[in-house]
UniProtKB/Swiss-Prot annotation:
<dbReference type="InterPro" id="IPR005749">
    <property type="entry name" value="Ribosomal_uL15_bac-type"/>
</dbReference>
<dbReference type="InterPro" id="IPR030878">
    <property type="entry name" value="Ribosomal_uL15"/>
</dbReference>
<dbReference type="InterPro" id="IPR036227">
    <property type="entry name" value="Ribosomal_uL15/eL18_sf"/>
</dbReference>
<dbReference type="GO" id="GO:0003735">
    <property type="term" value="F:structural constituent of ribosome"/>
</dbReference>
<dbReference type="GO" id="GO:0006412">
    <property type="term" value="P:translation"/>
</dbReference>
<feature type="region of interest" description="Disordered">
    <location>
        <begin position="1"/>
        <end position="42"/>
    </location>
</feature>
<dbReference type="GO" id="GO:0019843">
    <property type="term" value="F:rRNA binding"/>
</dbReference>
<dbReference type="Pfam" id="PF00828">
    <property type="entry name" value="Ribosomal_L27A"/>
</dbReference>
<feature type="compositionally biased region" description="Basic and acidic residues">
    <location>
        <begin position="15"/>
        <end position="28"/>
    </location>
</feature>
<comment type="function">
    <text>Binds to the 23S rRNA.</text>
</comment>
<keyword id="KW-0699">rRNA-binding</keyword>
<comment type="subunit">
    <text>Part of the 50S ribosomal subunit.</text>
</comment>
<dbReference type="InterPro" id="IPR001196">
    <property type="entry name" value="Ribosomal_uL15_CS"/>
</dbReference>
<keyword id="KW-0694">RNA-binding</keyword>
<dbReference type="InterPro" id="IPR021131">
    <property type="entry name" value="Ribosomal_uL15/eL18"/>
</dbReference>
<keyword id="KW-0689">Ribosomal protein</keyword>
<comment type="similarity">
    <text>Belongs to the universal ribosomal protein uL15 family.</text>
</comment>
Length: 147
């Protein structure tokens, strides 16, 4: 006989009913697993309560500084990476970089100057650093900044 999905059953003891406490002496009644006396036996204590010691949220320092809400995040591509992805040179824009898997689509792109490039490329990006511009133009390429 072949085993089918509707024949499968949980292993014995794998599924146990939830124990209902405080429902009579014979089944975890009376103290219901809370022990005797004290705050924890009588009522809830806050989840962050540490028994009177200084709580972790008061021991740790407050965050310093601030976060600029208007910061622009760029997907970065180095000149060396462009040389790897486009060994024949040609036009390098956002669409080509997305197709090559270097950046994600619908994101701002910044070209950085790490690495070497020996082929002429026509780079179009939102931002290009000074060193990247120098290397690309020295190799015979052109740079167009969109931003």
């Amino acid at each position: 006989m072949t085993i089918k999905l509707h024949h499968l059953r949980p292993a014995p003891g794998a599924k146990t009913d939830k124990t209902r406490v405080g429902r009579g002496e014979g089944s975890k009644g009376k103290t219901a697993g809370r022990g005797t006396k004290g705050t924890k036996a009588r009522k809830n204590v806050p989840a962050a309560f540490e028994g009177g010691q200084m709580p972790i949220h008061m021991r740790l320092p407050k965050l310093k500084g601030f976060t600029n809400k208007f910061r622009t995040e760029y997907q970065v591509v180095n000149v060396g990476r462009i040389a790897e992805l486009f060994p024949q040179g040609g036009t390098v824009g956002k669409a080509e970089l997305v197709a090559a898997g270097a950046v994600r689509k619908n994101q701002l792109v910044k070209v950085l100057g790490d690495g070497e490039i020996g082929v002429a490329v026509q780079v179009t990006a939102d931002k290009v650093t000074g060193s990247a511009k120098e290397k690309i133009t020295a190799a015979g390429g052109t740079v167009t900044e969109l931003a």
